[in-house]
Amino acid sequence: MVVKKIRRSCPIGFTLVELLVAIGIIAILMGLLLPAVQMAREAARRTSCGSQMRQLGLAVANYESAKGRLPPGYAGLTASRRFNTWITTLLPYLEQQAVYDQMLADYVTTPDPFDNPGVHRGFGHTLPLLLCPSSTTGFEPATDLTGYPSVAFTTYLGVNGQDFTTRDGVFYLDSKTRMAEIRDGLSNTIMIGERPPSTDRWFGWWYAGYGQLGTSSLDSLMGVRERNIGSRGNSICGPGPFSFGNGHPEFQCSSLHYWSQHPGGAQWVASVSRWN
C-alpha cells in the first residue's frame, strides 16, 4: 500500500496586518523626511535670494568704480529721466543692456513715465533677479492697476536712511554719494534690504517709483524707520515710524518696513557689497 504525502503550500504575499504595518512605517518615514526636504528647499531659496542681492551689490560697486559715485536713489522732476530709480541706472551692470537701451528710447518719447505709462515698456518688464524666490508675490506684472497697463516689481529696496524725509542714507533724491562720504564705515552701513511686494501691488515698483510724495519711498527705496503719510490704503497704519519686524503680503502696514518670507529674517547688502 502506497501512502501519498500531501504537501501543504505556504501562502505567498502579505497579510492584511503586515500590509497595514508596512504602510504605517512608510507614512512615518515620509512624515520625517518631508519637513527636511522642505527645509532644504527653503534654505536653497534663501541662498538664491542672497546671491541675487550680492549681484546687486556688485553692480553698485562696479558703477561706483566707473563713475566715482554711487547711483542716485531716484531722479526728481528736474531730471531728464524723471523718477528713474537706482535699479534702472544699474541695468547695464546687471547684463540688462537691452532693457536699458529700451528705457532710454522711451524716455526720449516721454521724459515723465507717469504722464504716459503705456509708452514706457519697462514698467511691466519682470526681472527675476529682482525677486527673492521665497517671496509669494510680484512674479507676475500687475495689469489691473488703474492708469497703468502693466507694472513689474522688486523685492529689494535701497536704503534711504532713517526715513524718506531725512535723506541720510546711501540712496535718495538725486543722490551722488561717494564711498568716502560714508562716515560710519562701509561694512557698518546697509545699502540694500528686503521687503516683498504687497498683494495690493501699489508699492515695490522697480522701473519708476513715485512712492510717497514723489520720493520713491516704499517703491525702490525705504528707510530703516520709515514714516507713513497714509497713501494707497496705508492710512490705517498710523504715522510711524516703522522698523524691522514680521510681515505678510496682505497686511497693508507690512509695506512700511523691511522683512522677508524666509526663515532668519530680511537679508542686507552693506556698502562694501557684503551680504548679511
Where are these regions (language model features)?
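N-terminal secretory signal peptides that target proteins for export/translocation
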Residues: 1-9
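Surface-exposed loop/linker segments characteristic of extracytoplasmic
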Residues: 2, 28, 32, 43-276
